[in-house]
Amino acid sequence: YKMQDKFHVERVAANSADVFTTVSEITAIEAEKILGRKPEVILNNGLTIRKFPTIEETSVKHLVSREQIRQFLTFYFFPYYTFELEHNLIYFIVGRYEFKNKGMDTLINALGKLNDSLKKKNSKRTISVFFWIPMENDGINMEILENKNYYMHIKNYVDFQSENILKKIVMDIVKSKTPNVNSLFTKEFLKDLEKDMIVFKRTGNPPISTHRIKNDDDPTIKGFREAGLNNCKDDKVKVILFPVYLTGNDGLLNLSYYDSMAGSHLGIFPSYYEPWG
């Protein structure tokens, strides 16, 4: 097909450039030995700390972003079954789609073992693991989009009635009464919610991807299956493949990368090769 391999292309590019740079001393040494040219300039990667929030601001952002992630988990999983969000940890991996180089295979295998271990212990703890890995897809899974719409309808309906419910709670308290369902909710309100919940509920298991993946033999999807990560009710480790960029306007999570990370508990980056870049 008259295509050159990556090494030849990189070597020619390095030796043809007017100025050759790398991002660290380690990659500079590698470039000199492998590509045959010593970089003239090293442009070290780094973070501008002043652009990032303080510890106090991060704590607040964690709570706000975590609540939005939990809302996503609610409409993603709860139509099929429920679990305690208070006992749920949020993990993530993010990066280019390089299945082995980024250690996705290692992570999936480890999550499979963790899932088995937590199930044997009958742990109350659950873990939701996001794979924020942009890849080719055919758009949002319509089932998930419907789940979100049904959930938002229920939430908005309750919010619309919340002022009246609050008044009843306050009145019961000042009258030294214990608030109960019959005094707080009207029959009409409960009947409407019952109808909404029937529509909201689904059978089967939640999808393992938010979007329709074109490749039926995708290694991540196959890896989930082989590791026993099927998002079944008894699985303690839940996986969510999120194959789009986190722009804050994706239609599901609607958080930026930094906000998504701030709302999580742990990021995992088991890269096979990472040249300090």
Q: At which residue positions do the language-model features occur?
A:
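Catalytic cores of nucleotide-sugar-dependent glycosyltransferases that transfer UDP/GDP/TDP-activated
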Residues: 1-277
